[in-house]
Amino acid sequence: KEDIINMMVGRVIYEDPKEHSMVAPDAPVVLKVEHLNAGKMVQDVSFELRKGEILGFSGLMGAGRTETARALFGADPKQSGKISIMDKSGQLREVTINSPQDAVKYGIGYLSEDRRRYGVVVQKSVNENTTLATMEEFTNGIFINKAKEKEVSERYVKELATKTPSGDQLVVNLSGGNQQKVVIAKWLTRDSDIL
């Protein structure tokens, strides 16, 4: 069976499932998706995410991984299904997500597999990209508080060990891994509950 799968995909697939979760079985459910349908690739998808849990979608290209994440984030339209998110009181409640703005409002951040296209603005600095999802917190009218922006950006550069000469460095000049750290910093700055 393994040889056939490896020949089909053209590489070795390692399946080493975890024997037990590090998340307590009674950890609260923070996201529940039921019977999500979005386009041809996302058909009747249901899952739960518990607080502290890392949930990954795997599969070959075209299996619907990216499309599921984009529908959950509101970047692609969903035809049907129910999305429930834990609110501030700790209760799951059904929400309507029709756009990325809705998803962000409900505490969801999106880490795209194509970070250069959907995660960062490569011709902007590390500082500017770090605050993209929270720009309203760094502006006073039409002016950006650059000192506050720099302070927050420097904190995440340090916490995530981002290799950059300064926060003024353009993201296009960073390695792919460091660009990904800038995307993560953007959502951490937003204080997203779900990435």
Language-model segments: which ranges?
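Glycine-rich phosphate-binding loops of nucleotide-dependent enzymes
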Residues: 1-195
